Amino acid sequence: MSLITSSGAFAQKIVVAHRGASGYLPEHTLEAKAMAYAMGADYIEQDVVMTKDDQLIVIHDITLDRTTDVGEQFPGRARADGKHYVIDFTLAEIRQLAASEGARIVNGQRVQGYAARFPMRTSSFRISTLAEELELIQGMNKSTGRDIGIYPEIKSPEFHLAEGKDLGRAVVAELKAYGYASKEQKVFLQTFSWEEVKRLRDEILPEAGIDLKLVMLVGDDEEYQWMFNESGMQEVGRYADGFGPDKSLLIAPDSTPGNLKISNLVELAHSNGMQVHPYTFRADAGQVAKWAGSFEEMLEAFFFEAGIDGAFTDFPDRAVEFLRQR
């Protein structure tokens, strides 16, 4: 499907597989990406972090602890805060780690983040490089005749720069090497850093000789509040083609079935030429909005009452089917 980004008129609504089909398989594994592809997602997300030897890997956190067995494989390698940072390990070392469904620490024990998902520490999964994932998606595009897009995120660019690594420039170089060069292609490049969005638009992309659609990710944090009005959104729209808010910024969590408290952020973004792709839609117990009777009712409200253009979801099959039925 074509995407129109130069005006307020946008193409068909899209489904973005958040960390792949992460509701069914461990996040950011190639298996989760292949499943998302087969489920019909329009775009597949890649969170990108850099290793000690400047390799680009696909992982959500800048640390390895939540989704791997790094503490067991490499004792004594944590920083003072007790965490194992990707940037302190080479790709060869990271290849030795087992990837797994995410965990949190409760009373010193690892507890699976979402209890009903793929069992933690079972089967065999690995962390992949950005290149490997791009080759997987492009390979399936060739073998199926489809054109499924990519949605990479530059993770914590300021952290990387402070460590002497220009992650944004490296990601753009990798995308260019794999043929992503224009806004007409199915690629969105996202980040939570306003400074990085400006640097990408003003410096990195022009120097690389390519032009990609950029998405400004935002949370409900003080640093983003200036964007949530006409003048702020106009400034964001000078640099970004898309606006990626936490979904709670669009429909207030304390809404009720008969009274949805819908903000004006979608309207503001659209009037400034940006698509709106909020995150994250989950069907797990406790993750469906209290004002919605089901996952699908939640999607209905966001897509057709709030007016979003696309959604990040851990359950791409259900979102795809919802839009097909709609």
For each of these PLM feature ranges, what is it?
Residues 7-326:
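Phosphate-group recognition and catalysis centered on beta-loop-alpha active-site segments
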Residues 1-5:
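Bacterial N-terminal signal peptides
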